[in-house]
């Protein structure tokens, strides 16, 4: 799995607009502003999982509902049976949505699986989604396959250029400070 430090360094190098940082699921910032974005790990800070479990991305566009990306195509409100953890993301997205007045505070998410279950490139997928404009309503990558996930993963790994494998870093090792 790509480390928090690697994801944060990459986002800073490409000057990702609105970048807040990389967080464990129980340490996401409360002071979200319109235009902010972040990557979070399903694992909380003190759950004993050294490298975390799975990266997801969250974006908070100005004047719009919050957006959530999971490379496996799962929504933020589901209990993750694969990882065996509850998702804190539904409540967080609702609390920090910047939907216009009259529009209920809500969120959207991608419903398409892009990543193979056999790879650990979820962090790279999150970066690609954030750099691609954070759209959850249309296909952000027309050239990617909806069936050949291994090919997709190889392609996103080459595009982002980060390694994918065991990491000495814990997800909470990097925050938004600084």
Segments the model singles out, each with a brief description of its role:
Residues 16-19, 73, 173-176:
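Intrinsically disordered, low-complexity segments enriched in small/polar residues
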Residues 8-9, 26, 30-31, 36, ...:
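Acidic-enriched, low-complexity/disordered segments with a strong bias for Aspartate over Glutamate
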Residues 1-57, 61-66:
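Cysteine protease catalytic domains with a Cys-His-Asp triad
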Residues 39-135:
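Cysteine protease-like catalytic core of ubiquitin/ubiquitin-like
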Residues 23, 28, 60, 75, ...:
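Intrinsic-disorder/low-complexity coil detector
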Residues 1-21, 116-134, 146-162:
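Cysteine-nucleophile protease catalytic domains, especially the papain-like/related folds used
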Residues 104-114, 131-178:
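Catalytic-core signature of thiol
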